[in-house]
Amino acid sequence: MIDRINADRLAFVVHVGDITSGRGPCGDQWLEARQKQFARFKAPFVLLPGDNEWLDCKRSGFDPLERLAKWRELFCIPVKELPLERQKGKYCENVRWQHDGFVFAGLNIPGGNNNLGDDPAEHGERMQAVLAWLDESEALARQRDGLVVLMHANPFLVRPIGADGYQEVRERLRRLGETMPGKVLLVHGDTHRFRDDEPLPGLRRVEVYGWPHIRWAKARIERTGARLFEVELMPQ
């Protein structure tokens, strides 16, 4: 797939997380091998964390926060030929860049109910940083042509019982859709299917495939059409 993506002339490539399965492997060797694999991309490459590479590593006997620290060590690095801004402090995985008049904001919001049930303190501290980053990105985007929000989790999953780890970000997305209608695109993964819809008024959502469907989606800015982005699901 990397070879097929490299054959296209892309401004950048984004992976929205889950670079291993929900049961591992989670060790350093696996992550380092993925780092070398991603280095093959010709276009600037941005990686966001999914739950499989830190939260779910508890199933393999790892400490999730230690695995997230290792992820940061390997992947919080400069991105070639892309003016990438990282959030200051320990949440370096929250990123932002601008391209062709649009603001792109990448957030550490993983699946697994965003870790609310297992570690409410971690969830709360991280989400405070995430929401501050999203608010800053929104302020920038209001001076530009629009905003693209990227994360791993599907924030629209309905939980039958228990606390909702995505309520805060969903409310932010609702506000964005209401105040910037048609100018906000949400891209996420997590639930392993392709969707291109409008889950909230004014908010367009694209979910990309996950295992076992190994496919990628290509987006193009299209200012003259009814939608700002043309999204095409590419062959395997």
How should these model regions be labeled?
Residues 1, 33-37, 172:
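A short acidic, amphipathic alpha-helical/loop segment
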Residues 1-28:
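N-terminal active-site segment of His-dependent metallophosphoesterases
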Residues 3-11, 41, 147, 212-215, ...:
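Acidic, histidine-bearing metal-coordination/catalytic regions of metal-dependent phosphoesterases
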Residues 3-12, 98, 105, 119-199:
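His/acidic metal-ligating clusters that form di-metal
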Residues 17-18, 50-51, 152, 189-190:
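Active-site glycine-centered loops adjacent to acidic/histidine catalytic or metal-binding residues
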Residues 19-22, 111-114, 154-157:
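A short, flexible beta-alpha/helix-coil linker loop
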Residues 20, 86, 184-188:
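Residue-level detector of alpha-helical recognition elements and their boundaries
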Residues 25, 29-129, 196-227:
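Extended active-site neighborhood of metal-dependent phosphoesterases/phosphodiesterases
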